Curated annotation (Swiss-Prot):
Its EC number is 2.4.2.14. The lineage of its organism: Eukaryota, Fungi, Dikarya, Ascomycota, Taphrinomycotina. This is Amidophosphoribosyltransferase. Its cofactor is Mg(2+). The gene is ade4. GO terms for biological process: 'de novo' IMP biosynthetic process; adenine metabolic process; purine nucleobase biosynthetic process; purine nucleotide biosynthetic process. Pfam families: GATase_7 (PF13537). Residues 2-238 form the Glutamine amidotransferase type-2 domain. It comes from Schizosaccharomyces pombe (strain 972 / ATCC 24843). Mg(2+) binds at residues 383-384. It catalyses: 5-phospho-beta-D-ribosylamine + L-glutamate + diphosphate = 5-phospho-alpha-D-ribose 1-diphosphate + L-glutamine + H2O. Binds 1 Mg(2+) ion per subunit. Keywords: Glutamine amidotransferase, Glycosyltransferase, Magnesium, Metal-binding, Phosphoprotein, Purine biosynthesis, Transferase. In the C-terminal section; belongs to the purine/pyrimidine phosphoribosyltransferase family.
Amino acid sequence: MCGILALMLADPHQQACPEIYEGLYSLQHRGQDAAGIVTAGNKGRLYQCKGSGMVADVFSQHQLRQLVGSMGIGHLRYPTAGSCAHSEAQPFYVNSPYGLVLGHNGNLINGPELRRFLDTEAHRHVNTGSDSELLLNIFAYELQRLDKFRINENDIFEALRNVYDRVNGGYACVAMIAGLGVLGFRDPNGIRPLVIGERDTPEGKDYMLASESVVLTQFGYRTFRDIRPGECVFIRRSNREDILAGFRGPRLFSRQILPCLRFTPDIFEYVYFARPDSVIDGLSVYQSRLNMGEKLAHTIMKRFGPDYMEKIDAVIPVPDSARTSALALAQTAQLPYVEAFIKNRYIGRTFIMPGQQIRRKSVRRKLNVQPQEFFDKNVLIVDDSIVRGTTSREIVQMARESGAKNVYLASCAPMITHPHVYGIDLADCKDLIAYGKTEDEVAEAISADGVIYQTLEDLLDSCRTAELTEFEVGLFTGEYTTGASKEYLVHLEQMRIANNRARKHSFAEDEEREAPEDISLHNTHSDVTFDFV
């Protein structure tokens, strides 16, 4: 899972970089492994800065000042099953044709097939194991096949039609063509989210594309909508013909490249990944989590029986993503709600940290307890999900160390028994704590007195609207929207093993080693001075 963002300002003399930079801060929860920004100057030159780490670590004020131009794209990487190399920081760039950059959120399930095609037929070199580089080169190949000196919006849509025919998976992308404009597109099942907004200015309309609506509202984009599954939007920089025709500012073009196939957004966005103040595909993430808490409350009351209030002294959330659901659960069941875990806000989200050992250590760094809220009490701890069990074991142990009599754990999500194939590095089946186990066996594995899972039907009901009736739930059922062959799942596991092996070297003796310098063209990590054009 990653965060993506694209911006086109109406005023060609304004700089897009500051807003992209701040926007990435708002999406930081979507990826903490690497960050990158690429902008385009008015004469078409691209300026890039990217590297490993969080937004605050990657960009200095000196580097930001060199990212000039009124349009650009940004990316935050979440470590998936691919390599952890510094070279895989996005956006990716190819010079031919036209100068293209692309940032991608998701996963392609026919990656090995695409890699062979690019090698044997398209004769394009792919330098990393990233699906994003595959997508970029497929797009570049299809544009190259048009064999045009200059392209327009119709050419872009035609090329993307062929891209859709070749790739399979869940993806949302933003891209930029040097000197021409920015675009965004989404897979035909709508698995990964993408939203577009517009903002009125004296020079015309500014446009922004982002993974979540929270970025748009932060910057005053009052009119926004979700990109439809299979749709592409292209925002062209204003040119001389536009000015002569009386148009002001960038021009927006939209086309439904493919008809929507099923419209199955990934339900894990609502469970965990997205910010609660975002709206995805018309559904408030906050409201969906309230619904999850209410549904889970009824399951718990049924599980514990009529005297459940005598068996549970306090409902305690695991901050932050479980807070909303835990509060709704407590209110529905008329149980005391207590903030007994105190979060260190300077530690990243443990779920998306690269490596099991790092996650385990980070739980204790991230959370501390209020002992008086546990001592001599029966506590119900509410978490958004239970994946590997790393966090769950630690928080149960912390509760017991603080004197809790009985510790029960409730999950807002059902049992996760299968890998996620669309860009979230959950784990292989054998590493998922619920794989092949009952609720009682999971409770024993994490040393809890009981574990209560949300039912799949209740989770679906929590997120359904008039427009949203189906969701991607393969991690619970093993049935994926696009299908996933056994060969691909084996390939995914092999990539994850190689990735974990690389990370063991990277984090030897608990110290993160400095990554090699990125020597990509125009990378502002150096002290080279660029022309501000």
